[in-house]
């Protein structure tokens, strides 16, 4: 539809050019005519549809945007013991709300893997001293297509609210991995994995041990690639308030029973939060992190490592020390150039087909009357990606219920503190296949909110030839959704405030999900209720 409108726009533009050519008086009017046509095309090419408010969708509700199933949009919703799937049409009109009555009372976690016209729903629940990991198939109408199937069970020592199993899948969704991590003692973990294909047929069941040097061991992301290979990083810190001084890359081939451990030599560096990403195009693993040169010092640069699966060797390793010009791009309006990256966090690692990759970071912090902002707590505190509890079970950070908390997600211990959340500039770095920096650029924004970070930060989606960032900006005391794109050469195009915005809806872009090449679903808050908007570009 947008391409057709674009052709019509070009046709009209050509006719205007023929009429105006050679006529100076008419040429004076050309700018306003062309501007009007361009604005008309921009308005037509962008479309926003809002769902109606459902009085059952309170702001305390947990939810997950499942995605596009057939011609429908499916959203999972949970409030207390109620579980439903709401099915919307292409204009976000509610077609049905399907209760998931088969779910037991004590559901610990729910995950969805969407395909073209169905989705797998994997959930875990506890019955007496047994935790079950089960699966059902959901059709495009939100209805159950199969009886529940138990994928695995685990014995536990009593009642608990924490999940045991984690689920990850490959980029092409043809490999699905369910795993659990049991802490045996202070220095030993046992990891059990179940690898399935996209028919949910079991391909491989494995179990292996991991040794850590002390109680300060932490793990990175857990990933599975299109071949079914499993990878994660095992990190070591010298203390609970320190950064990473040692990391091993742990790799298990899909059909193997043993693991390969690749030590990473950090020399004089210590690392911040470590991010991993599979490059399925080139059979590589990309690892990246900010690094420090001094204890309690400033972030000095960006460390990157590329590990080649085929040769099982390190293909590239780079330390990018930030220049003053990069620091000027990254810092906040009132920030210091030396500390420009101290509040930046890596949000995305994006591989491309030629072996290069992009790294996206965001400036993010909070302030409180009672407690100063602490990067250590954000990275290693309870509920965060690197948290490693020392009870019977260790579980990875893929708990979808955590994060959909609209009230002060840093208030982990019940204090009623006033908290202001701040999210500012986005930095994008692009490296070639050898790990050399090709370009960097900044998307400038200035966001803050009190008592909740649900309306700040951003969401990105990839259209193939560019990456689009969506984020709120305050204009005349109102939060308005903004858009900016960056192309393969690092050129940024900042679009004006999105058209057709309903000022009564507050967007929460960080919880959005891309459901098509140019379509994204974003949750909104309307008064005290959650609803959803579909945006097409």
Set out the residue ranges of the language-model regions.
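Loop/turn-rich, solvent-exposed surfaces of beta-rich toroidal or solenoidal domains
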Residues: 290, 347-349, 356-365, 404-425, ...
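Short beta-strand elements that form the blades of beta-propeller/WD-repeat-like
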Residues: 68-80, 117-126, 173-185, 228-239, ...
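Structural signature of eukaryotic scaffold interfaces centered on beta-propeller domains
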Residues: 56-69, 111-116, 125, 163-173, ...
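Beta-strand-rich domains and repeat architectures in extracellular enzymes and scaffolds
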Residues: 52-85
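Blade-loop segments of beta-propeller domains
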Residues: 93-131, 148-161, 209-218, 444-445
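Conserved blade-ending motifs and adjacent loop-strand segments that build the rim/top face
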Residues: 263-272, 316-341, 441-458, 489-516
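Structural motif
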Residues: 81-86, 128-136, 186-193, 240-250, ...
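Beta-propeller blade signature
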Residues: 133-141, 190-201, 244-257, 300-313, ...
């Amino acid at each position: 539809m947008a391409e057709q409108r674009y052709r019509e726009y070009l046709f009209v533009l050509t006719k205007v050019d023929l009429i105006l050519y050679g006529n100076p008086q008419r040429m004076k009017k050309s700018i306003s005519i062309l501007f009007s046509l361009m604005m008309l095309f921009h308005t037509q090419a962008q479309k926003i549809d809002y769902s109606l408010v459902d009085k059952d969708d309170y702001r305390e509700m947990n939810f997950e945007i499942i995605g596009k199933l057939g011609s429908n949009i499916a959203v999972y919703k949970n409030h207390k013991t109620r579980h439903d799937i709401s099915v919307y049409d292409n204009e976000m009109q509610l077609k049905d709300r399907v209760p998931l009555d088969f779910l037991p009372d004590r559901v610990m976690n729910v995950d969805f893997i969407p395909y073209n016209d169905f989705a797998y729903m994997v959930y875990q629940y506890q019955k007496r001293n047994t935790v079950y990991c089960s699966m059902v198939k959901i059709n495009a109408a939100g209805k159950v297509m199969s009886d529940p199937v138990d994928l695995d069970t685990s014995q536990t020592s009593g009642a608990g609210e924490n999940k045991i199993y984690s689920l990850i899948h490959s980029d092409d969704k043809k490999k699905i991995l369910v795993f659990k991590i049991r802490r045996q003692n202070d220095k030993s973990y046992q990891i059990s994995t179940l690898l399935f294909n996209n028919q949910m047929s079991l391909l491989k069941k494995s179990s292996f041990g991991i040794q850590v040097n002390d109680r300060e061991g932490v793990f990175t992301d857990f990933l599975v690639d299109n071949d079914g290979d499993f990878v994660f990083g095992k990190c070591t810190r010298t203390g609970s308030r320190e950064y990473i001084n040692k990391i091993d890359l742990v790799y298990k081939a899909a059909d193997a029973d043993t693991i390969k451990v690749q030590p990473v030599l950090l020399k004089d560096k210590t690392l911040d939060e470590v991010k991993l990403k599979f490059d399925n195009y080139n059979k590589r693993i990309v690892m990246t992190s900010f690094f420090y040169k001094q204890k309690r010092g400033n972030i000095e640069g960006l460390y990157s490592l590329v590990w080649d699966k085929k040769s099982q060797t390190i293909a590239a390793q780079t330390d990018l020390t930030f220049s003053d010009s990069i620091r000027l791009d990254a810092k906040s309006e009132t920030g210091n150039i030396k500390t420009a990256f101290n509040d930046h966090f890596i949000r995305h690692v994006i591989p491309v087909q030629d072996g290069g990759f992009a790294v996206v970071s965001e400036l993010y912090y909070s302030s409180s009357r009672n407690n100063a902002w602490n990067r250590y707590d954000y990275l290693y505190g309870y509920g965060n990606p690197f948290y490693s509890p020392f009870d019977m079970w260790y579980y990875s950070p893929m708990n979808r219920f955590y994060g959909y908390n609209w009230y002060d997600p840093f208030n982990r211990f019940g204090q009623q503190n006033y908290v202001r959340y701040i999210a500012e500039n986005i930095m994008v770095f692009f490296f070639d296949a050898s790990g050399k920096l090709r370009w960097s650029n900044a998307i400038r924004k200035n966001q803050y909110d009190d008592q909740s970070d649900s309306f700040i930060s951003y969401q990105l989606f990839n259209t193939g030839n560019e990456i689009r960032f969506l984020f709120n900006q305050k204009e005349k005391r109102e939060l308005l959704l903004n858009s900016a794109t960056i192309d393969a050469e690092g050129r940024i195009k900042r679009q004006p405030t999105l058209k057709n915005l309903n000022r009564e809806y507050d967007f929460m872009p960080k919880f959005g999900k891309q459901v098509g090449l140019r379509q994204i679903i974003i949750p909104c808050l309307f008064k005290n209720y959650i609803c959803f908007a579909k945006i097409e570009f």
